[in-house]
């Protein structure tokens, strides 16, 4: 989800409460495309950047796994990412920011009840202490916020704010400056409906789970960032499994949305090239966007990339 409203890192529950058809022959896209655009395919799947082609597409599109934070390390991506972003006709993000009503969005983050009514005294003190120590915010001042969104404040503090915008929003700003068309895969209301399908108590459990991690907050943040920039989707899956908690959460926030994303990507204009930025947690797995697109008849190939150190 978009970082300002959820900041669910990798779309996982803890520090994230704030990611089989393959054409046997060459795709319909001429080989000249990859030569012209200056990239080569990766020997393995340790990459966040993927080419989507075939199945009637006149131009290739590109799928890029993002992480919704402002830490400068995740902005040190390969120049080919910038090149393909510039090449694409359309930038697609999870939610088109132009379609969000800020007042409505703010209301969606609030609940009628008070978080005090869901926490024991010990839980309240623990969460209040953590929030104040790491963000300077007292729980009392945000007690009417849905617990799911309290993680956004926690995540922003843990992952650092070197850059002005989170990664996906930075691409959005660049697209707007260059008058590139921007679209969204999902609607804001769809993501909020997913949040509201989790009970307040379940949301609180996700917040409290993150406080009980054996790693320090700094170690948690470093581990997540390092896993992300490694581009290793298998390691990403392992990290997700460490935190994903209840199967209900994974189904609602990852699997169901993966299917919706793949369906809508498949409906894109075949004459246009899209640069599609979605949370990295949506890429891997049997029901990840990559495999779902392959099942729809697209050729989805890993592009060789690296991060600058």
Regions found by a protein language model. Give the residues of each.
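Signal peptide processing junction and immediate N-terminal pro/mature segment
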Residues: 28-34
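A short catalytic or substrate-binding loop motif that flags glycine-/basic-rich loops and adjacent residues
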Residues: 42-45
């Amino acid at each position: 989800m978009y970082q300002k409203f959820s900041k669910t890192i990798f779309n996982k529950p803890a520090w994230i409460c704030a990611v089989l058809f393959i054409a046997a022959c060459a795709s319909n896209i001429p080989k000249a495309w990859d030569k012209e655009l200056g990239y080569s395919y990766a020997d393995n799947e340790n990459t966040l950047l993927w080419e989507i082609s075939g199945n009637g597409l006149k131009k290739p599109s590109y799928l890029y796994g993002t992480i919704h934070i402002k830490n400068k390390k995740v902005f040190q991506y390969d120049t080919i990412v910038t090149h393909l972003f510039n090449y694409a006709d359309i930038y697609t993000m999870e939610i088109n920011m132009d379609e969000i009503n800020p007042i409505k969005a703010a209301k969606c983050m609030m609940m009628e009840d008070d978080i005090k009514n869901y926490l024991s005294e010990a839980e309240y003190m623990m969460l209040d202490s953590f929030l104040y120590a790491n963000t300077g915010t007292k729980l009392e001042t945000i007690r009417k916020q849905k617990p799911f969104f309290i993680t956004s404040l926690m995540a922003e503090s843990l992952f650092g704010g070197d850059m002005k915008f989170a990664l996906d929003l930075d691409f959005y700003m660049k697209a707007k400056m260059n008058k590139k068309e921007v679209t969204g895969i999902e609607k804001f209301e769809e993501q909020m409906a997913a949040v509201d399908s989790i009970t307040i108590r379940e949301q609180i459990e996700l917040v409290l789970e993150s406080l009980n991690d054996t790693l320090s907050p700094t170690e948690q943040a470093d581990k997540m960032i390092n896993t992300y920039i490694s581009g290793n989707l298998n390691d990403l899956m392992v990290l997700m499994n460490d935190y994903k908690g209840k199967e209900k959460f994974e189904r609602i926030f990852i699997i169901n949305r993966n299917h919706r994303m793949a369906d809508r990507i498949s409906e894109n204009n075949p004459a246009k090239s899209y640069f599609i930025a979605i949370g990295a947690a949506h890429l891997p797995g049997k029901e990840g966007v990559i495999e779902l697109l392959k099942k729809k008849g697209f050729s989805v190939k890993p592009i060789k990339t690296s991060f600058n150190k």
